[in-house]
C-alpha cells in the first residue's frame, strides 16, 4: 500500500512548512535565521540581486511555506489513493469518500441469513451484498462429487465446493482473485493428483490443515483473503451423507447417486441423523431481520440444511420473515414435473414446523428457443400455481425474476429488490 511512505513524506512537509513560518516570523529555530542571512548574503554578493538582508528570511520563509504545502498536498493525495485502492481493489474510480460512505452504509444494513447451496445460493448472495454486509450464508455440506468429493475422501475434510462459491459471490476483491479461486486444473499436462480440482477448494483444504483440522476457522481465514461482505458457515461441522428413499421404496446413499437415479425421490435423510449446527448458525437465525431459503436444488441443497437438528426449531422461533425462493426450471432427476407448490410441499414434508411465510415465484417465461433448449435436457418451466401456494398457508410473491443469457436463472438484482421490499 505504501502508506508509511506517504505519511512520512507528509510529516516532512509539515516540518518544512513550520521552518518556513519560523523564518517568515524572524524566529531562530536551531539558528536557522543566521544561516538564511548568510545564504542571502552569498546570493547578493555573487549575483546582481541586492534586496537587502532584512528581506532574506521573508523570501526564504515564504518559499519554504509553499514547498511544505506542496509536499503535504502531494503526500495526502497519494495516501488517499493508496487507501482507496486497498478498500476497493480493482476499482480505483471510486473516491475515498464514496468508499467510506458505501462501507458504512453496508455495515448498517439489515441482517440477512441465506440458507441453501449450489449456484442458486451464490446468485442470491451477489444481489444481497449490494444492500448489506450483514449477511450470513448457511451452506449445505453433502456434496460428494467432483473436486469436493475427492477432497472429502483424500483429506477427510468437509466438501468445500458450495462454500467456495458463496465466498466468491460475497467477495469484495479484484476480479483476478475471483478468477483464481474458480480456476480448475484440467488438460493432459495436469497430473492425476491435480486434475479436476479447483484452486479455491485446494486453498480451503490447505487452510484446514494450517488450522489444525478446524474447517470453520479455515473458512474464516479464506474469507479474509477474499475480503468478503458477510460470513459463510457450514450448516454442520460433522461429515454427513445424504440418503434417499425413492418412489419404489429403494434406498440410495450419496448425493451423486441419488441425483443420477431415474427414480423419483420420496424422502431425503441425513446420515447420521442427529448432527447439529455451529452455534453461530443458530445465533444468526435468532438475530436476523429476514431469512431467505434458496434458490437451489430442493432435495440436495435446500432440505439437507433443514434436516440438521436445531435449525428448523431456530427458524420457527425466529421473529424474522422467512422467504423461500422457488426455482425457475425443474431439475432432471430431482424435481421432474414439479410445480411451484410441489417444491413447497417437498420442504414442508421434511420439516415438522411451519418455517416459511413468503414464497417468491417467477411468472415470466423465457424465450421459446430457450425453452426448447432446456426441454431437450428434460427441464421445463416451473408452473407458478400461486393459488395452491396460498392455500398451503404461504403468501406467494409472483413476478419476473429471471435473467436470460445463455442459461435461464434468477436475476440477482431482481431477487434482492424483492427481498428488500419485504422489509419496508
Regions of interest found by a model, annotated:
Residues 1-91, 108, 142-262, 418-420:
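Electropositive, gly/pro-rich neighborhoods at or near active sites that engage anionic ligands
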Residues 2-7, 90, 337-424:
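C-terminal functional extensions of proteins
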Residues 94-108, 276-282:
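A short, basic/flexible loop-to-alpha-helix module at the beginning of a structural domain
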Residues 119-125, 147, 300-307:
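Short glycine/serine/threonine-rich phosphate/pyrophosphate-binding segments
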Residues 133, 318-322, 356, 394:
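A short helix->loop->beta-strand "cap" motif at the edges of active sites that frequently abuts
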Residues 142-148, 300, 322-324, 329-333, ...:
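Short gly/pro/ser/thr-enriched loop/turn and capping motifs at secondary-structure boundaries
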Residues 288:
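An anion/phosphate-binding loop that grips the pyrophosphate of nucleotide cofactors and donors
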Residues 305-312, 338-343:
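Charged helix-capping and loop-helix junction motifs
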